[in-house]
Regions:
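Short, small-residue-biased leader/transition segments that mark boundaries at the very start
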Residues: 2-7
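Conserved, mostly hydrophobic/aromatic
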Residues: 10
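Long, distal/terminal scaffolding or interaction modules
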Residues: 15-18, 36-347
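Short glycine/threonine-rich loop-to-helix capping motif typified by GTGT followed
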Residues: 19-33
Length: 347
């Protein structure tokens, strides 16, 4: 194909442009006749069949809820750095809700805002990429559910999702966010009162998340951050996980069946730090979502604690141990990390 040699800004600009295709010599060797595709008499370079220049880069951003509602209602608060909370209904066609407003926050204040400076209470079904890339200072609270890529690239913001009051099902047994939630998250918090789909927290490098169950390939390629799962995991959990920590409630003692052990180890929770970490994360989860499962665990914590497993990458565990040793010698946290890295590298 010659298409790769032609500068185009959108795939749409290539639609109908068979004049940009050329036949490779090998095609004739395999007796392939591509003339019906390449010799299209209806192709007109000036007026392509499907591509319409009028639609070029028209993403109709003015129709998004960010432009129509968030930037309108929160403009004064944004300009004056005032705390503000608003409510809004969302639908599953509202993609990347919060992202444009989040970009305006970042432009003005970078990551200097306090948590919950702007709180948006949403009701309904969140579209794809709900809360993607939202920064420090922005909290999105969703009563309902959300599609795939929930919290994609989370960058310091806070996401809370829980089902409406009066539901007749158990939240911890039902999916509330779709696949690939928190993909590539770098910082921030997410509290999910229900089950997430497949590939939860893939490439998470610094966010903290609490969820009540995940599908297959959870925490895949994770490099940092903390994840607490107070429910079941799907198969191939922690595949390629090289950093961060996952705490999993293994009530049926069968996590080993779904855990990918190539790069991680599973161990009981014994250190005081880990115990407090789990308790604090569940406490926050209950405070934000009113999770019944979370309350059940807190009310009988001594019973549930032995059922938790700590999933930690082998090399990450070595690094943490070495950093602790260096700090014990009086080095600062930053110096300890550097020295630990080089000492492990030297072997």
């Amino acid at each position: 194909s010659a298409a790769s040699d032609v500068y185009k800004r959108q795939v749409d600009e290539l639609v109908g442009r068979t004049d940009l295709l050329k036949e490779l010599p090998e095609a004739k060797e395999y007796h392939l006749d591509l003339s019906a595709i390449l010799n299209n008499p209806y192709v007109d370079k000036k007026h392509p069949i499907c591509y319409n220049k009028k639609n070029e880069y028209n993403f109709e951003l003015e129709k998004t809820l960010d432009e129509k509602v968030l930037l309108t209602k929160l403009k004064t608060a944004l300009d004056k750095k005032q705390k503000r909370s608003i409510s809004i209904d969302v639908g599953n066609t509202d993609r990347s809700f919060g992202t444009i407003f989040g970009s305006e926050i970042t432009k003005k204040y970078y990551n200097t805002l306090e948590d919950d400076t702007f709180t948006v209470q949403c009701t309904g079904a969140g579209g794809q990429s709900f809360g993607a890339f939202i920064p420090n200072g922005l909290t999105l609270e969703l009563v309902g559910d959300s599609n795939d890529y929930f919290g994609k690239g989370l960058s310091g913001g806070k996401l809370i999702v829980y089902p409406p009051k009066g539901i007749r099902f158990k939240a911890e047994e039902n999916i509330i966010v779709g696949n690939v939630a928190l993909y590539g998250a770098t910082s921030g918090q997410a509290y999910i009162n229900g089950v997430a789909g497949e590939r939860f927290c893939v490439r998470n490098s610094g966010a903290t998340a609490v969820v009540e169950g995940v599908g297959d390939h959870g925490c895949e390629y994770m490099t940092g951050g903390k994840v607490l799962i107070i429910g079941k995991t799907g198969k191939n959990f922690a595949a390629g996980m090289s950093g961060g920590v996952a705490y999993v409630l293994d009530e049926d003692n069968d996590l080993y069946l779904s855990l990918n052990k190539e790069m991680v180890s599973s161990e009981p929770v014994v250190s005081k730090y880990d115990v407090m970490e789990i308790k604090d994360m569940i406490t926050a989860h209950v405070a934000y979502t009113n999770s019944e499962k979370g309350k059940e665990i807190l009310n009988d914590f001594s019973k549930y604690l032995p059922k938790f497993k700590k999933i930690i990458p082998h090399d990450y565990k070595k690094m943490l141990k070495k950093i602790s040793e260096m700090e014990g010698k009086g080095l600062s946290a930053e110096q300890a990390q550097i020295e630990a890295f080089y000492e492990i590298k030297r072997g």
